[in-house]
Swiss-Prot record:
GO CC terms in record: virion component
Chief localisation class: virion
Encoding gene per record: NPH1
Residues of the Helicase ATP-binding domain: 48-213
Gene Ontology BP term (one): DNA-templated transcription
An example molecular function term from Gene Ontology annotations: ATP binding
Official protein name in the record: Nucleoside triphosphatase I
Role played: DNA-dependent ATPase required for providing the needed energy to achieve the termination of early transcripts. Acts in concert with the RAP94 subunit of the virion RNA polymerase and the capping enzyme/VTF to catalyze release of UUUUUNU-containing nascent RNA from the elongation complex. NPH-I must bind ssDNA in order to exhibit ATPase activity.
């Protein structure tokens, strides 16, 4: 009797046989260039197109792997299965022109029964409600619908309840998407490099979107960072994902250059505030502890970036009054600096950490003044001036304690820049085009692109050598998205091989007595990530790629049947009694079979071949044909090769 996994693989081969005549290339109708799909794009497209009953799929692909191109290829060729399709595409407003309209235009799909819904636009969502009623009233055998959700984690974050007693306004939209996607013969294609960003509850919503009512996933299904009743869950959720990663490493780990993808090097810059900035931080600390928003560390985060004489509290002021106060403070700061610019001689002294003894007293005075307000901005300027190429700088704060004052520092240091934020909506796409041009390959025309959260997803930069993260986001997934703006497939191909790297700089500010909101946020990020990593590993195991590679030569089925059975069979409640007992372990060096360049420290249970890190089972050793664990020697270390704990 075959396992469900084997039967699913036979269905994949049925789909591949059915779609064997689909072209692997697609024509760019603007440039007449022939675009060749990557093997993974072609494989997943054919399986999703060829299996009518595989109605939902998540493209869990790293940034830069071509999710948009693959989606449009699927749209173009679904007519192989059925001639009449209507497409509803959910996206962020900032992704409408690029990549979506541009990709659709290039591939000859613009305007062909396509409706965009901007999930961060209230007017667009109202239009979707009208569209939904029209679709529901007219669903018939003559039309089918493909729903595409780009950055699906954004939709889930807008849906998920903030507490057990509250529901989000977006929930009704979410439920309508689920109903449409699971109407007979319709399909759903979701996309994200980081489908789970904050907690396990997001996985519950993701399952309810892709395969609704099959299980009510709970956080306590993960015990000691191990997924309970893994096989039951695997059989019920099998093949809801396609999984492609540059590396299994997290955002804080160095990665080597691989074909098409730049290497990543992590640097931490610990900087100390001046006594003046430290004093304002302590005032902000007291304010945050009293404030209802203190848990968000709001005021401390602001003054860690820029502290000008006092903290800016809105209090009972109206928004107009508050904006006026902030504007006055900004003008006051500008008046202190005026149009001052450092000389090239002073910039060289600063860049090289040379003594200021030979610098002009007027320049030293200005330098001491601006350093007094922000140790972070000073460090960012030094990183930029020492960079050999173009620089991205992420700063989510747009107004006073953020981009507005940062740009003044850049002007003083004669650093050229463009801005991509909510305040530059009319010009930002043009700015990115200029920044990415070949004649700016090394930043000789425009050195820096400052971008806020508006540019943290969806947009692409080319030939970046340094990223500065000035203010940390709350989630590791957001950091991954930020880094992913610059490390994309072929993003560095115009640079020589030795320049195909990205240095990622985290600037961590502390007061003179060691207080640091940046360190607090780092600790919070890392504490959230363990359970998310368990689910990410699970999604790899149930992916199309894992199953197909295991049973690549399985005989195709004659007709589809398995996915309707799976979708309508509820997974039994997961056994609550799985517990982890104490075990004896030994220190070990290991690496993943997917990337032999990154070596980790762990602890091995010799009885089971399972490796642990921080009491978490994270990998298991691989046996060769002689039943001996695979290993190699590197730098006098015995390094064992491992695979996922769930394989």
């Amino acid at each position: 009797m075959h396992s469900i996994e084997h039967i699913v693989a036979r269905h994949f081969n049925y789909a591949l046989e059915k779609t064997k005549d689909l072209p692997k290339s697609i024509n760019n109708e603007i440039t007449n260039e022939i675009i060749i799909l990557k093997d993974y794009q072609y494989l997943v497209s054919r399986i999703f197109i060829g299996l009518s009953e595989l109605n939902s799929l998540l493209l869990f692909w790293d940034t830069g792997y071509g999710k948009t191109l693959t989606s449009v290829y699927i749209m173009k060729h679904l007519k192989l299965v059925f001639p009449q399709w209507f497409f509803v595409i959910f996206i962020k407003k900032s992704l409408y022109v690029d990549p979506w309209l541009n990709t659709l235009s290039k591939l000859g799909m613009k305007g062909q029964n396509i409706k965009f819904v901007l999930y961060d636009s209230s007017s667009s969502l109202k239009q979707f409600n009208v569209l939904y009623r029209t679709i529901i009233s007219s669903i018939n055998t003559k039309n089918r619908i493909l729903i595409i959700i780009d950055e699906v984690h954004q939709v889930i974050s807008r849906t998920i309840e903030k507490s057990s007693s509250t529901q989000r306004n977006f929930l009704s939209i979410f439920n309508k998407i689920v109903k449409l996607a699971n109407s007979e013969n319709n399909k759903l294609l979701c996309m994200s490099a980081t489908p789970i960003t904050n907690n396990v509850l997001e996985f519950k919503y993701l399952i309810n979107l892709l395969r609704p009512k099959i299980i009510e996933f709970k956080e306590d299904f993960i015990v000691n960072n191990t997924l309970k009743n893994h096989e039951q869950l695997k059989n019920g959720l099998i093949s809801i994902t396609s999984y492609q990663k540059i590396s299994e490493a997290d955002s804080f780990t160095n990665t080597s250059y691989t074909e098409g993808f730049a290497s990543k090097n992590i640097f931490y810059h610990n900087v100390t505030m001046t006594p003046e900035q430290s004093n304002i931080f302590n005032i902000a600390d007291k304010h945050d502890k009293k404030s209802a928003l203190g848990g968000l560390k709001t005021m401390r985060r602001l003054v860690s970036s820029f502290a000008f004489y006092d903290i800016k509290i809105k209090g009972s002021m109206s928004q107009i009054e508050y904006n006026k106060m902030v504007s006055e403070k900004l003008n006051e700061f500008k008046s202190i600096i005026g149009n001052f610019k450092f000389s090239n001689e002073f910039i060289d002294i600063f860049r090289n950490n040379d003594s200021f003894s030979n610098a002009k007293s007027s320049e030293i005075e200005i330098f001491d003044k601006i350093k007094q307000y922000s140790c972070k901005y000073i460090e960012a300027c030094k990183i930029i001036l020492n960079s050999n190429g173009k620089v991205l700088l992420y700063e989510p704060l747009v107004s006073f304690e953020g981009i507005s004052t940062l740009k003044i520092y850049f002007n003083i240091f004669n650093i050229s820049y463009v801005e991509y934020s909510s305040k530059t909506e009319s010009t930002r796409d043009y700015n990115i085009d200029i920044f990415n041009k070949y004649d700016n390959l090394y930043g000789n025309k425009i050195k820096v692109c400052i971008f806020s959260a508006a540019g943290s997803e969806g947009i692409s930069f080319s030939s970046i050598n340094d990223i500065i993260i000035l203010d940390l986001p709350w989630k590791e997934s957001d950091i991954k998205q930020i880094i992913g703006r610059s490390i994309r497939l072929n993003s560095h191909e115009e640079l020589p091989i030795e320049k195909r790297y990205v240095n990622v700089h985290f600037i961590i500010a502390s007061t003179i007595d060691g207080k640091s909101v940046d360190k607090e946020i780092f600790d919070l990020i890392k504490s959230k990530q363990d359970k998310i990593n368990v689910l990410n590993s699970f999604m790899k195991v149930i992916s199309i790629e894992q199953i197909h590679s295991k049973y690549k030569y399985a005989e195709p089925v004659e007709n589809e049947y398995i996915f309707n059975n799976i979708r309508h069979t509820k997974i039994d409640d997961v056994n609550e009694n799985n517990v982890i007992t104490k075990i004896i372990v030994s220190p070990i060096y290991y690496c993943s079979e997917d990337n032999l360049n990154i070596i980790y420290n762990g602890y091995l249970d010799k009885k089971t071949g399972i490796i642990y890190s921080n009491n978490i089972p994270i990998a298991k050793l691989i046996l060769d044909e002689n039943n001996i664990y695979k290993f190699f020697i590197k730098d006098d270390k015995l390094v064992y090769i491992t695979k996922s704990i769930y394989e």
